[in-house]
Amino acid sequence: NQVLAIRGSYHGKSHSTVAITGQRNWSSTSLYPFNVTYVHGGYRYRSPFGHLSDAEFTAACVADLENMIEVGTAGDIACMIAEPIQGVGGFVTPPDGFFGAMKEVLDRHGILFIADEVQTGWGRTGEHFWGYQSHGITPDIFTFAKGLGNGMAMAGVVASAELMDSLPANSISTF
């Protein structure tokens, strides 16, 4: 039940997605189904690493990730979820390649990377079709919604067949 998330992140309003949201003003209780550890993301304004160059900033955040995995968790972390660009968290854009550097650490530890593309997917970054493409990676799982439905309640999740088939359910739909 251990998850890594990014400080200042927003992942939704359901009980589980509020649990991994990295903003205290969205949390109404501490009784959540996950044990979440928050790591530094692309937010620079009040970050202790904000004064660094892009490469140094990325390296400092990756070092923080390594440290939190080692000392801030029990070690059996399921995944890290991140928005390629934080929307509700202040429209925060990390340096290109940022999540690629983080994914290298996650892969070494056997931790899945989930890209929350609800706000950035379907060409909404203006540069790429998916926000994660700016980081030179393919996430293990990615979620998408707003750009797909154009106002209608549509969403999706994409992962490898191995991951999707590991869920012994008839459906994962919420609609």
Segments from the language model and where they lie:
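Conserved N-terminal phosphate-binding loop of PLP-dependent enzymes in the Aspartate aminotransferase
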Residues: 1-175
